[in-house]
A protein has these predicted regions:
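Helix-turn-helix DNA-binding elements, focusing on the entry/boundary residues of the two helices
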Residues: 13, 24, 35, 50-53
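Recognition helix of helix-turn-helix/homeodomain-like DNA-binding domains
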Residues: 31-48, 69
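Short basic helix-loop element that most often maps to the first helix and adjoining turn
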Residues: 11-30
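Conserved binding/catalytic microenvironments
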Residues: 5, 98-394
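DNA major-groove recognition helix of helix-turn-helix/homeodomain DNA-binding modules
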Residues: 51-66
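Short, charged recognition helix plus adjacent turn
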Residues: 69-97
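A detector for short, charged/polar N-terminal pre-domain segments
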Residues: 1-8
Length: 394
């Protein structure tokens, strides 16, 4: 169910078109949608079908959720891609011939899917990552000796993008296989920082199984194996592992362990000094603040004051990747619902959706909070009902 009027959708498409310096004719040509349809959609006279919306979004280099807030076709696109993704990695260790793209073209495509993952643009990942992963696996097996480390790093990044959709859409077996591929490629890269990134992502397996104690042990093992934080990238790798360890310790009810790891993460965030993306993981002082919220919420409703205090003192800047910001607002909404602040909780959920619609729609806590608000609170009932239909909480 769309929460936008036809006029709002049309204005959004027109604004994106102008930002890319396209005429309506140019957009029609690029999207393979008729000029009459583009013109009618932009003036709010016609509702675009899912196929038309996706074609326009692809031509404008955005995800369809950025054109229509209530768009739910991403789930269909992801589920259509998952069998192909599974098939691609079935024999990743077996050479299958050369890739269809050269090194430079692959490098650009890999950087693009990393950006999409950080921006929670799962529909775009689903469209591109099966074929890209196939090519990068082939590149790993055929690259010259001097390119082997680069090829392995590219495979780690691409498999991680595939894992993003598998994990977010609760295909945990496929997610675990992709993480195994990441670890295999990280070993081929023979780079401790790449291995640290793979260990960071591996924690998803433990989250999914609720195996918090062994997950914490695995992260602490990875921290001990990580290089000394003598450079910004090494400090970021170690700091990200400490952030992850703090959250899984919190999920396991280990408040002291969570605080210890959070302290280490904070120190390393201060050392890094500025927020950045390091081997596909966002780290810096702002990410540490977001994980302060994560830890407080992970520890449970008895720590709600701690969670609310984080939000009183700090809010995520727009410069942070969309998935990070969305996660913060979802966790804040959970704390606000615990604190009997339903209006604030709903505002936080809407902020999460504005930051990353696909991430919010697939987040179990966002659905849980929405369902609770709808059952027990009547404020803004019509708007909340629209939101609940969109997120699948009805």
């Amino acid at each position: 169910m769309s929460v936008d009027s036809l006029r709002e959708v049309g204005e959004r498409i027109a604004a994106r078109r102008r930002a890319r310096r396209l005429t309506q004719t140019g957009l029609a040509t690029a999207s393979h949608v008729s000029y009459a349809t583009v013109r009618a959609v932009e003036r709010g006279a016609r509702r675009p079908s899912d196929e038309v919306l996706e074609a326009l979004a692809a031509a404008l280099a955005v995800d369809a959720t950025q054109l229509r807030t209530g768009y739910v076709g991403t789930e269909r696109r992801v589920h259509q891609a998952l069998p192909a993704l599974s098939a691609v990695i079935a024999g990743y260790d077996i050479p299958q011939g050369p890739p269809t793209r050269g090194h430079a073209e692959l490098a650009v495509a890999v950087d693009e899917v990393v950006d999409w993952r950080l921006g929670a643009q799962y529909g775009r990942i689903a469209t591109e990552v099966p074929a890209l992963l196939c090519d990068v696996i082939r590149y790993v097996h055929t690259a010259r000796a001097a390119e082997q480390q680069t090829a392995a790093r590219m495979l780690v990044a691409t498999a991680r993008a595939g894992d993003a959709i598998a994990f977010k859409y609760r295909e945990h077996d496929l997610s675990a296989r992709l993480i195994d591929l990441m670890r295999w490629a990280a070993d081929r890269a023979a780079d401790p920082l790449v291995q640290a990134a793979a260990a960071y992502v591996r924690t998803e397996i433990f989250f999914a199984a609720r195996a918090h104690a062994v997950g914490l042990a695995a992260l602490e093992q990875a921290i001990h194996a990580a290089p000394a934080p003598s450079s910004r990238s090494a400090a970021a790798a170690r700091g990200a592992l400490h952030m992850r360890a703090a959250v899984i310790a919190g999920r396991g009810g280990d408040a002291n362990g969570a605080d210890t790891h959070l302290t280490h993460a904070r120190q390393l965030g201060d050392q890094v000094a500025r927020e950045g993306v390091y081997l596909g993981t966002t780290f810096g002082p702002d990410s540490v603040r977001i994980h302060e919220m994560s830890v407080a919420v992970s520890l449970g409703s008895n720590h709600v004051d701690r969670a609310l205090r984080v939000a009183t003192e700090w809010m995520p800047p727009a410069s942070l990747p969309a998935e990070r910001r969305s996660g913060f607002y979802i966790e804040l909404a959970r704390a606000q619902e615990w604190a009997n602040l339903p209006g604030d909780a709903f505002e936080s959920l809407k902020a999460a959706r504005a930051a990353a619609p696909q991430h919010t729609r697939e987040h179990p806590w966002a659905r849980e909070v929405t369902s609770s608000l709808r059952r027990f609170h009547r404020a803004d009932a019509e708007s909340l009902s629209h939101f609940a239909h969109w997120i699948g909480a009805v």
